[in-house]
A protein has these predicted regions:
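Low-complexity, compositionally biased segments
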Residues: 27, 35, 47, 57, ...
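Short, intrinsically disordered, low-complexity terminal segments
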Residues: 2, 82-85, 91, 127-128, ...
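Amphipathic, interaction-prone secondary-structure segments
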Residues: 40, 44-99
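Contiguous, amphipathic alpha-helical segments that mediate oligomerization or scaffolding
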Residues: 2-58
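Extended low-polarity, hydrophobic cluster-rich segments
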Residues: 33-40, 87-91, 100-102, 134, ...
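Residue-identity detector for threonine
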Residues: 12-14, 37-39, 46, 50, ...
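Intrinsically disordered, low-complexity regions
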Residues: 5-6, 10, 60, 67, ...
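Ampiphathic alpha-helical segments that act as solvent-exposed interaction surfaces
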Residues: 95-150
């Protein structure tokens, strides 16, 4: 194989490896952010439950408000050479997105913060954003019975 051809192919492989590493990193971050978010929402629903509101929050994977499922899903869009990540929060017409930027900062209703900061302790703005989502989900389900309009 000619040296020039080898260099072309090696550059392609290097670019792919960089993309694959970024994709794996963003998948991990998105999954971790979703897990933290589910735990926070579970805590908020537990508070609702103490006030006799119809919620299900026995575990972080099965969350419901007034019988309507709350979904917290990591989303990773992988279109070579770009990787975008977010976490989608949805319930009965209410939705929010937590954006994970390429530099591992997280935007979730307030000033962006580093993912490493989330691992040390959850910022108050992140907790408040989750509370606003739970409120919106509750109010939307209460108004519509959980039926979303298109």
């Amino acid at each position: 194989m000619a040296q020039a051809a080898r260099e072309i192919l090696q550059a392609t492989i290097t670019e792919w490896m960089k993309f694959a590493a970024e994709r794996d990193k963003m998948r991990k971050i998105a999954n971790d952010v979703a897990m933290v978010t589910r735990t926070i929402i579970k805590d908020h629903l537990t508070f609702f439950k103490t006030k006799q509101i119809d919620v299900e929050c026995e575990n972080s994977e099965d969350l419901k408000v007034l019988g309507t499922k709350i979904s917290v899903d990591p989303i990773v869009e992988e279109t070579f050479p770009t990787v975008k990540a977010s976490v989608a929060l949805k319930c009965g017409g209410a939705s929010r997105f937590i954006i994970i930027n390429v530099n591992a900062t997280i935007s979730a209703g307030g000033p962006p913060f580093m993912f490493e900061e989330l691992k040390k302790g959850v910022p108050e703005t992140f907790i408040n954003n989750a509370a606003e989502f739970v409120r919106d989900a509750f109010l939307n389900v209460a108004r519509t019975g959980g039926v979303t309009t298109k």
